[in-house]
Regions:
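Alpha/beta enzyme core
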Residues: 19-62, 71-251
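Short intrinsically disordered, low-complexity coil segments enriched in acidic
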Residues: 1-3, 251-253
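A broadly tuned, weak detector of single residues within folded domains
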Residues: 12-13, 76
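Active-site "substrate specificity/gating" loop of NAD(P)-dependent dehydrogenases
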Residues: 66-67
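Intrinsically disordered, low-complexity regulatory segments in eukaryotic proteins
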Residues: 3-12
Length: 253
């Protein structure tokens, strides 16, 4: 594989356009921006995000080869490691778990996005650090891929980005932080971030569909800039929510 650092700007753009056009991974994906836009935002040095990239590839393969992918929520690296040892193929990191007992604020919050925006990425990083340590231990014992008793600890992590903690720029930056931490998949919901409520609570407020889609586009742009095929999941509370900031956007969908 050719390193991005050895390609000119024009070659990087051409290679990215070719990947989008020919790679089955991107079939049906509409971005709303160009390869030139992505390359312009990358800078001259492209940093590799191996855990996020390989995790996304694993998760995509699971989604397309398994009837369903069973996961459990993990608050700590040890919990995630035990889940992998028990046979789970992916890890889920929920925002309500982080709100309740694993946020950067050291508080116990309700599921209303009250915790600091860096909280979920930090837990993702801790889980991947545990996976890395477990892998180092078995490697030091002479166990590698294909050997008896070898366990692939690097299960892909799907992380909760809530409603993006703000607007499109906030979603862009949060997605970057998730990828830097090694998340394989990230989901965003269409609630108003400033009034976010847990799924079973009343008073949920939706944003216009156009705004929700714009956040997803911003998140995909962030992944493209970071050079990872991160799985992007869209969640909606439309079935249960009774309020919306504007009816115009959803009336024209």
């Amino acid at each position: 594989m050719t390193s991005w650092t050895h390609l000119t700007r024009e070659q990087q753009i051409a290679q990215l356009e070719k990947d989008w056009a020919e790679n089955p991974r991107w079939k049906g994906i509409k971005r709303g921006y160009s390869a030139a836009d992505v390359v312009k935002l990358r800078g001259s040095l492209q940093v590799e995000h191996t855990l996020a990239k390989r995790g996304a590839e694993k998760l995509w393969n699971l989604i397309n080869t398994e009837p369903f992918v069973a996961t459990l929520g993990a608050l700590t690296g040890n919990q995630a490691m035990q889940q992998v040892k028990a046979g789970l193929k992916a890890i889920y990191l929920s925002g309500w778990q982080v709100a309740g007992d694993a946020n950067s604020n050291g508080e116990m919050y309700p599921d209303q996005s009250l915790y600091s925006v860096d909280s979920v990425p930090k837990v993702v990083k801790k889980i991947n650090a545990t996976f890395t340590r477990a892998d180092q231990i078995q490697w030091s014992e002479g166990k590698g891929p294909g050997d008896e008793g070898y366990l692939d600890y690097f299960a892909p992590i799907v992380a909760d980005a809530e409603a993006g903690f703000g607007g499109v720029l906030n979603a862009f930056e949060l997605m970057k932080s998730m990828i830097e931490a090694g998340a394989a998949g990230v989901h965003f919901e269409d609630q108003l971030a400033a009034a976010k409520k847990c799924g079973h609570m009343g008073g949920k407020v939706l944003v216009p569909t156009r705004e929700a889609v714009s956040k997803l586009v911003a998140a995909r742009l962030a992944a493209d800039v970071m050079g990872t095929p991160t799985i992007l999941l869209a969640r909606t509370d439309a079935e249960a929510a009774d309020l919306v900031t504007s009816e115009i956007g959803r009336a024209h969908v």
